[in-house]
């Protein structure tokens, strides 16, 4: 995670130097390389070197790269919809990935005579045994090949001006072979050096730092929520569907509507409104499950447990679902959080691109990871501490959860609330400073 941030901070300057298409192809190459070896290799040291490191490089490049491309290929009028559409497509990918993850786990799992589920049983392929999680990477490798083919058709060195006209941008002459690599490295270093001494850049970083508190909830969804879900709902619970699918599908429908309705509202104001909604949503998970018990044996309960999560095949069996009432606070929490996310998250991406000076978009957008990089040194240990206190594990299996396990989301929600509070309190100060610097 930290490696992702370090590489991502360098990506923008690379894009500004060699262009979008070449940078994207480099990224996809690293992802192909990592997914190939993670499909076959089982040695932890080799997985780290041949899998995790190239995967971190590939992923780190993609995020800033897409934001830079949207900035170059949209006008001021279409930027909100452009970033909104990207956010929709990204979450469509998450939704498909979440469904595939749970489907693959279920398809390749084995249940013994005692009813114990082994999720990682796997299968034989090409005369070799692949575990369930190796099969995830085999399938991912196939999808990445499709991405590589599509990337070859991208046009480079063009952008759209504010009048909506297609403009060709000059291609930088970097020489050939080793000289090209050397000149690219020099240009990247020069770009980074020039940007980090600008006052505008540090004001920009200050604003982004205030958004960290609510953005850290995403980190907890990735690292804290899976263990929380397994501990509270039981092993084999469809935790990928509960967050990954529900969140992504809602985003797909909500973001275009919100983007269109609010396209003339400032990004900063939308960030405040959306972060309030998302922050307060965390506290829904703290509500006692007994409050929602009446919803289980209703048409909504049938929709959730039979049609969506596929936990049982008939209404009569719903009361037998392990920790059935515990699902409801989490579902409503994620639902409301996602509504807030659809308001603030795409606009944060747009705000990041709006502030970046022309010609330095890539460097600014990539270096916007800097506060997020610093936050990981705090939020990672926070996640580990919360899990240890409220939902402990031993040898990869959950121990009995604390009766106060929902307090995990109280502390996460309290942290998230700092974002709208600080954005509101310091907004005028930062905007005034940005205005002064832009006039110089």
Language-model regions: role of each:
Residues 29-43, 276-323:
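C-terminal ends and interior cores of transmembrane alpha-helices
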Residues 1-2, 225-250, 273, 324-332, ...:
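Loop-to-transmembrane helix entry
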Residues 7-20, 105, 253-273, 387:
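Helix-to-loop junctions at the C-terminal end of transmembrane segments
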Residues 80-117, 128, 143-144, 244-247, ...:
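Glycine-rich segments within core transmembrane alpha-helices of 12-TM secondary carriers
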Residues 6-42:
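Conserved MFS/SLC helix-loop-helix module at the cytosolic interface between two early adjacent transmembrane helices
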Residues 61-75, 229, 342-357:
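Intracellular juxtamembrane helix-capping segments at the cytosolic ends
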Residues 76-80, 101-226, 230-236, 254, ...:
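Intracellular loop-helix junctions on the cytosolic face of multi-pass helical membrane proteins
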Residues 3-8, 239-264, 274-287:
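Transmembrane alpha-helices of Major Facilitator/SLC transporters
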């Amino acid at each position: 995670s930290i490696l992702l941030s370090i590489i991502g901070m360098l990506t923008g300057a690379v894009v500004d130097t060699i262009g979008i298409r070449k940078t994207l192809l480099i990224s996809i190459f690293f992802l192909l390389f990592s997914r190939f070896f993670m499909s076959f290799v089982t040695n932890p040291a080799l997985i780290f070197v041949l899998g995790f490191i190239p995967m971190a490089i590939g992923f780190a490049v993609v995020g800033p790269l897409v934001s830079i491309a949207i900035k170059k290929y949209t006008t001021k009028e279409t930027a909100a919809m452009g970033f909104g559409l990207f956010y929709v497509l990204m979450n469509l990918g998450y939704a498909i990935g979440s469904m595939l993850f749970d489907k693959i786990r279920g398809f390749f799992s084995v249940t013994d005579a005692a009813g114990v589920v082994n999720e990682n049983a796997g299968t034989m392929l090409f005369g070799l045994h692949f575990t369930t999680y190796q099969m995830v990477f085999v399938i991912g490798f196939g999808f990445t090949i499709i991405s590589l083919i599509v990337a070859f058709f991208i046009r480079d060195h063009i952008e759209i001006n504010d009048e909506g006209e297609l403009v060709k941008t000059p291609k930088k002459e970097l020489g050939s072979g080793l000289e090209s690599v050397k000149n690219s490295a020099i240009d990247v270093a020069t770009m980074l050096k020039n940007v980090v001494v600008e006052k505008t850049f540090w004001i920009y970083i200050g604003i982004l730092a205030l958004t960290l508190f609510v953005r850290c909830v995403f980190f907890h969804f990735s690292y804290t929520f899976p263990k929380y879900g397994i501990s509270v709902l039981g092993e084999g619970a469809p935790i990928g569907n509960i967050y990954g699918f529900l969140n992504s599908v809602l985003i797909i429908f909500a973001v275009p509507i919100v983007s269109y309705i609010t396209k003339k509202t400032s990004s900063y104001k939308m960030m405040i409104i959306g972060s309030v909604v998302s922050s307060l949503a965390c506290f829904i998970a703290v509500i006692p499950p007994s409050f929602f018990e009446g919803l289980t044996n209703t048409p909504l309960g049938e929709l959730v447990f039979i049609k969506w999560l596929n936990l049982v095949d008939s209404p009569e069996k719903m009361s037998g679902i392990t920790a059935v009432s515990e699902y409801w606070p989490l579902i409503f929490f994620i639902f409301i959080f996602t509504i807030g996310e659809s308001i603030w998250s795409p606009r944060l991406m747009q705000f990041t691109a709006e502030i970046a000076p022309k010609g330095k978009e890539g460097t600014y957008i990539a270096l916007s990871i800097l506060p997020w990089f610093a936050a990981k040194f705090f939020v990672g240990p926070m996640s580990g501490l919360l899990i240890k206190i409220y939902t402990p594990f031993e040898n990869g299996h959950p121990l009995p959860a604390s009766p106060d396990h929902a307090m995990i989301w109280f502390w996460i929600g309290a942290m998230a609330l700092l974002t709208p509070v600080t954005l509101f309190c310091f907004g005028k100060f930062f905007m005034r400073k940005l205005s002064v610097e832009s006039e110089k």
